[in-house]
């Protein structure tokens, strides 16, 4: 990961879809993507983007995606992704909202945690501060699952955020605390 600022590449960046991956090989684009916290850099001339990152960059007109020598439009790529991941739209909405607010957003740490989130300016110099778990409004979330996710986030010394997406695609963020599930809730003060 490059900590120095790189000059912007010529937009839109050209990317290729190969099976489940989206990759960029233009050096200038790779440098810019890496400096902004997008994707995983394998070499000087290769960044692999996660699907939600590619969707976001496509929605910002910063990325053109091709597959088998044909351009894939946003909706076409989304339909392909939805076949394999029923939560991709939810993840994309949360990712977009957080990026638009200035956060750097990366893949989560397992336990169904969708993202790890860096404060603005912290990416590359400090660890992620938050873990985000996305859920559609009205979707049941068992207390034990929530408890296990919370325990996992605390074991990583991260703050857990539950991102709830309603049917209008509006997102409400809830910060969870161990106090909610600790001794205080059982009356053992």
Q: Where are these predicted regions, by residue range?
A:
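Long Lys/Arg-rich low-complexity intrinsically disordered regions in nucleic-acid-associated proteins
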Residues: 1-189
